[in-house]
């Protein structure tokens, strides 16, 4: 079962609490169209993007070990995050721009090279899997200790 992080965020329009499920988030970025640069969250199950007050950097702190990659938008160098579960392909186009393709026909033009994106994905996978392995080891040791206690 995929590990899930629930984020407590605040809606941009009225500051009310919004709870987001990390496994449903495709990407997070700052809306370049908005004057106040609100953060936008796009989810897999819902076509509607949500605007929140928290910055992508602040959100990334909570999602770093949950399979998210941090990169920078080419047009304004703002931070963008994407979930590696929704990653499809990354390549350089004819103009030399790096394009990241995600599920739901989402394209991101970023400053990082495809090699850098690849390394970031591997690092995100490693962090994600390491925590799963550590949790499994702890569960096994706890179960072994419980079994020993029952035998005694």
Whereabouts are the PLM-identified features?
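Eukaryotic intrinsically disordered, low-complexity regulatory linkers and tails enriched in Ser/Thr/Pro
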Residues: 1-152
């Amino acid at each position: 079962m995929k590990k899930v992080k629930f984020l407590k965020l605040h809606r941009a329009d009225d500051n009310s609490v919004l709870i987001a499920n990390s496994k449903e988030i495709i990407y997070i970025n700052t809306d370049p169209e908005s004057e106040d640069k609100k953060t936008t969250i796009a989810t897999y199950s819902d076509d509607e993007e949500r605007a929140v007050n928290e910055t992508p950097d602040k959100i990334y702190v909570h999602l770093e070990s949950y399979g998210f990659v941090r990169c920078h938008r080419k047009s304004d160098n703002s931070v963008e995050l994407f979930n590696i579960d929704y990653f499809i392909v990354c390549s350089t186009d004819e103009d030399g721009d790096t394009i990241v393709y995600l599920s739901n026909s989402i394209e991101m033009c970023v400053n990082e090279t495809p090699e850098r994106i690849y390394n970031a994905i591997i690092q995100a996978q490693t962090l994600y899997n390491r925590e799963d392995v550590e949790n499994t080891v702890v569960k096994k040791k706890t179960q072994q200790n419980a079994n020993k206690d029952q035998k005694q």
